[in-house]
From Swiss-Prot:
Species whose genome carries this gene: Chlorobium luteolum (strain DSM 273 / BCRC 81028 / 2530)
Protein localization: Cytoplasm, Nucleoid
Protein name listed in UniProt: Transcriptional regulator MraZ
InterPro entries cross-referenced by the UniProt entry: MraZ (IPR003444), MraZ_C (IPR035644), MraZ_dom (IPR020603), MraZ_N (IPR035642), MraZ_sf (IPR038619), SpoVT-AbrB_dom (IPR007159), SpoVT-AbrB_sf (IPR037914)
Subunit field text: Forms oligomers.
Annotated SpoVT-AbrB domain residues: 7-61, 90-133
Cellular component, GO annotation: cytoplasm; nucleoid
Coiled-coil region: none
CDD domains hit by this protein: MraZ_C (cd16321), MraZ_N (cd16320)
Cross-referenced PROSITE patterns: SPOVT_ABRB (PS51740)
PANTHER family reported for this sequence: TRANSCRIPTIONAL REGULATOR MRAZ (PTHR34701:SF1)
Biological process terms in GO annotation: negative regulation of DNA-templated transcription initiation
Length: 153
């Protein structure tokens, strides 16, 4: 898998484009896509997260998730709702030659992004936060790291 780690501060330009940090782009698998250089995928999947961030997935990672989602039943109300919520919150975007992705107004508004962002590498995905919202989340959970780590590790 890609193994994204660390964080980078960037800004969305006036056209709503976000530069994917070079160190994250270096983790992308090689591609021959005409819209990207040799080490950049032609596309990423962007999903609105329930915590008001945006999640970025490489196509192979999203396709694995999509197989799980597709296995859900259209005849079970909760499973059908989950499918609807997942796909309603998803867009596929293409990287340009400079390694930027366009973010729609709907997605920028969801995350509260006007300009500055923090991009966090989270193993198989990248998480895009508006800096103020990220600070609120981190400050609100400052004493919980040890408890969470103890519970899950």
């Amino acid at each position: 898998m890609a193994g994204f780690i660390g964080k980078e501060k960037h800004a969305v330009d006036e056209k709503g484009r976000l530069m994917i940090p070079a160190r994250f782009r270096r983790k992308f698998p090689e591609t021959s896509g005409s819209l990207a250089s040799k080490k950049e995928p032609a596309s990423l999947y962007v999903m609105k997260s329930p915590d008001s961030s945006l999640e970025l997935y490489l196509p192979d990672v999203w396709e694995e998730m999509a197989r799980t989602i597709s296995a859900l039943s259209d005849f079970h109300p909760d499973e059908r709702l989950l499918k609807t919520l997942m796909y309603e919150s998803l867009e596929m975007v293409e990287l340009d030659r400079q390694g930027r992705i366009p973010l729609s107004r709907e997605f920028l508004d969801h995350a509260g992004i006007t300009r500055d962002v923090v991009i966090i590498g989270a193993d198989t995905k990248m998480i895009v936060w508006e800096p103020g919202r990220l600070s609120e989340v981190l400050e609100g959970s400052s004493g919980r790291f040890a408890a969470l780590a103890g519970r899950y590790f």
